[in-house]
């Protein structure tokens, strides 16, 4: 399966992701709304909703200071980030570790709707 992210870079996944990390609070909520919440294994300290669900998920630092070693230890098969919320140097560091990264960058309501539509197939 191949997916084009908002950087216009292709991400190849061998199967539907089973171990997802979200480094964006709104994306964490979206993943739960899409029914993929049981496969989320890591979130930021700012990911607080859905309250009952994220409380037990491993925290991997903040949006601007993620713990790259903690992320790697979780063995994710998908990490979802945002072009404005997260730092580009962290994108590079995650990719250098060979971790699968999908970058979102919605800037309008229409693009936000498109992002949700793209996340559905991405997370199965």
Predicted regions and their residues:
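N-terminal ligand-binding lobe of clamshell/alpha-beta domains
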Residues: 1-124
